Curated annotation (Swiss-Prot):
InterPro entries: aa-tRNA-synt_IIb, aa-tRNA-synth_II, aa-tRNA-synth_II/BPL/LPL, Anticodon-bd, Anticodon-bd_dom_sf, Beta-grasp_dom_sf, TGS, TGS-like. This is Threonine--tRNA ligase. Homodimer. Binds 1 zinc ion per subunit. PANTHER family: THREONINE--TRNA LIGASE, CHLOROPLASTIC_MITOCHONDRIAL 2, THREONINE-TRNA LIGASE. It comes from Acinetobacter baumannii (strain ATCC 17978 / DSM 105126 / CIP 53.77 / LMG 1025 / NCDC KC755 / 5377). Residues 1-61 form the TGS domain. The gene is thrS. It is found in: Cytoplasm. Residues 242-533 are annotated as: Catalytic. Transmembrane segments: none annotated. SMART domains: tRNA_SAD (SM00863).
């Protein structure tokens, strides 16, 4: 007779096998009404599943993270139910949960339209209103094959073939529709009311472009209407902040078909890029890095020796000349080892920190390209530290401090850090892994911030720390990384002379702070919605005259601002001053300076911000000091 132990320690005894739902009902009708599933002995199960022995049980409701994930998974099945009713010719493939939502891959003889998506969503709502129970049946393998054969679901049959060890499988019935899944799923469609379909895109069977093309319907689902509304509002705000739209509106960059995944930087965007590069150059110089420059195109034999050819060839652009094969570098590390290898190195020379604003190219699939966030040609703030095993800890600690300071300068205060440790398949002895992992963990602890352990998620050649930023919409962007490498120095014959006058391989620390400049600028654009802090604004001030009589004085003010290092322009058009102010405000220029007869006579400027705040009249020198003070605060300064 099972004794059920609840999370608060209470126990309930039953004289027969009991389902999760029955336990919930024995506790109270309110809990039973909200029961989505259960966690029995730390394993998620359906509400209908029986408990036959003494067990621990947590009732899962929509308020739990697992409950929300189950709701989303069940919504994917509901998509299948609606699609098969509306489009019987469709073939269902897979429908997993993703962050904040779900999708379903479907084969159709024709593309889905937006009208189709609206019809599918409407049918889903009607099915939910029927308030039907979702029925789970553990089904023998042969019967599963028969079910999907009778229904002509060839992709489901392929998935069954992928699981030869499974003797029985879970089939979930939504009325006449049936889907295969490990579960768990909601017991009733009443839990699925707070959902929305969001978009349609293309996909490939098994994610391989050589296979048949599928269509992917995305959606989101939440515990209640309030959460759904908040999500929709956040998505609408994200769409307003789309870096592609803002990039066009502010004349920052463009992309075009003749160069897919390559950025055409316009003057305004290139100014932001240069500010980033100049800032990072000084930061790295101040922290003991030597800046180098390595070739764009390198003989393919180096990539074979480094191991990249075996593991990365399909993402590399290659070329051929004079009977030699070359690759356009997808990353900088092998070239940095070549620089390190020039000349004999002693332990006294270490650590050596080599930095490069390295231009890299990767042959990313065209379907994955996204504005300047996912490109084929990009520049990294890349650096490699060559050090002894004993120096790992200090180098990592210094890098963590440097990285967090840089992020604060760009206005990012919330940073998530994750330590990934040794996988099963790896190079290097355990003692070296022990030392490296402890060095990284100690450095994280010394920073005094929370961090997350990801066991087994490190690369085969060493543990790593990842740094992720949280933007104003709560989205998380992985940017920085520091990665121990015990492999590449061995493969590329990097060595130094130890204190005992012997040869040893240095540890190589791969590190980046911003990552790709292109992607980081995209993040900045969306984080600030184009309203860059003054230090990053392509134009920091626009000087405008009221009438032609102030034109010369306006140009003189612009000249003085430029002499003092400000990025300034004039607007001398024969337009009303209100029109010029509105237009320049739309360009997100932080400061708008107006000159009338009084300002010319007094040698002053009237200053207002892009948000409309009037800062009053001040001397040009006072305004210069104001901007320089704002620039010095970098991302910590907000233009009111």
């Amino acid at each position: 007779m099972p004794i059920i132990t609840l999370p608060n320690g209470d126990q309930k005894s039953f004289d027969h096998p009991v389902s999760v739902m029955e336990v919930a009902q024995s506790i109270g009708p309110g809990l039973a009404k909200n029961t989505v599933a259960g966690r029995v002995n730390d394993r998620l199960v359906d509400a209908c599943d029986l408990i036959t022995e003494d067990s621990t049980l947590q009732i899962i409701t929509p308020k739990d993270e697992e409950g929300l994930e189950i709701i989303r998974h069940s919504c994917a099945h509901l998509v299948g139910h609606a699609v098969k009713q509306l489009f019987p010719e469709a073939k269902m493939v897979i429908g997993p949960v993703i962050e904040e939502g779900f999708y379903y891959d479907i084969w159709m003889p024709r593309p889905f339209t937006l009208d189709d998506m609206a019809a599918i969503e409407e049918r889903m709502k009607k099915l939910i209103d029927q308030d039907y129970d979702v029925i789970k049946k553990m089904t023998p393998r042969d019967e599963v094959i028969k079910v999907f054969t009778d229904r002509g679901e060839e992709y489901k049959l392929r998935l069954v073939e992928d699981m030869p060890e499974e003797k029985a499988m879970g089939l979930y019935y939504h009325q006449e529709y049936v889907d295969m899944c490990r579960g768990p799923h909601v017991p009733n469609t009443k839990f699925l009311k707070s959902f929305k379909l969001t978009k349609i895109s293309g996909a490939y069977w098994r994610g391989d472009a050589k296979n048949e093309q599928l269509q992917r319907i995305y959606g989101t689902a939440w515990a209640d209407k309030k959460q759904l509304a908040a999500y929709i509002k956040r998505i609408e705000e994200a769409e307003k902040r789309d870096h592609r739209k803002i990039g066009k509106a502010l004349d920052l960059f463009h992309m075009q078909e003749e160069a897919p995944g390559m950025v055409f930087w316009h003057a305004n965007g290139w100014t932001i890029y240069q500010v980033l590069e100049q800032y990072m150059r000084k930061v790295q110089q101040d922290n003991g890095y030597q800046e180098i420059k390595t070739p764009q195109i390198v003989d393919f034999t180096l990539w074979e020796k480094s191991g990249h050819a075996a593991n990365y060839a399909e993402n590399m652009f290659t070329t051929h000349s004079e009977s030699r094969n070359y690759a356009v570098k997808p990353m900088n590390c092998p070239c940095h080892v070549q620089v390190f290898n020039q000349g004999l190195k002693s332990y006294r020379d270490l650590p050596i920190r080599l930095a490069e604003f390295g231009s890299c190219h990767r042959n990313e699939p065209s379907g994955s390209l996204h504005g300047i966030m996912r490109v084929r040609g990009f520049t990294q703030d890349d650096a490699h530290i060559f050090c002894t095993k004993e120096q790992i800890g200090k180098e990592v600690a210094d890098f963590i401090k440097l990285t967090l300071d840089v992020y604060k300068d760009f206005g990012f205060e919330e940073v998530q850090m994750k330590l990934s440790t040794r996988p099963e398949k790896r190079v290097g002895d355990d003692a070296l892994w022990d030392l490296a992992e402890k060095s990284l963990a100690d450095a994280l602890d010394a920073a005094g911030l929370e961090w997350e352990l990801q066991p087994g998620e490190g690369a085969f050649y060493g543990p790593k720390i990842e740094f992720s930023l949280k933007d104003c919409l709560g989205r998380v962007w992985q940017c920085g990384t520091i990665q121990c490498d015990f492999n590449l120095p061995v493969r590329l014959d990097a060595s130094y002379v130890t204190e005992e006058n012997e040869r040893d391989q240095p540890v190589m620390l791969h590190r980046a702070i911003l990552g790709s400049f292109e992607r980081f600028i995209g993040i900045l654009i969306e984080h600030y919605a184009g309203f860059m802090p003054p230090w990053l604004s392509p134009v920091q001030a626009c000087v405008m005259n009221i009438t032609d009589s102030q034109a010369e004085a306006s140009e003189q003010v612009v000249a003085k601002l430029k002499e003092n290092g400000l990025r300034a322009i004039s607007d001398l058009r024969n337009e009303k001053i209100g029109f010029k102010i509105r237009e320049r405000t739309l360009e997100r220029i932080p400061y708008l300076l107006v000159l009338g007869d009084r300002e010319v006579e007094e040698g002053t400027v009237n200053v207002r911000t892009r948000s409309g705040k009037n800062l009053g009249t001040m001397s040009v020198d006072a305004f210069i000091d104001l901007v320089k003070s704002a620039v010095a605060e970098r991302g910590r300064y907000i233009v009111e």
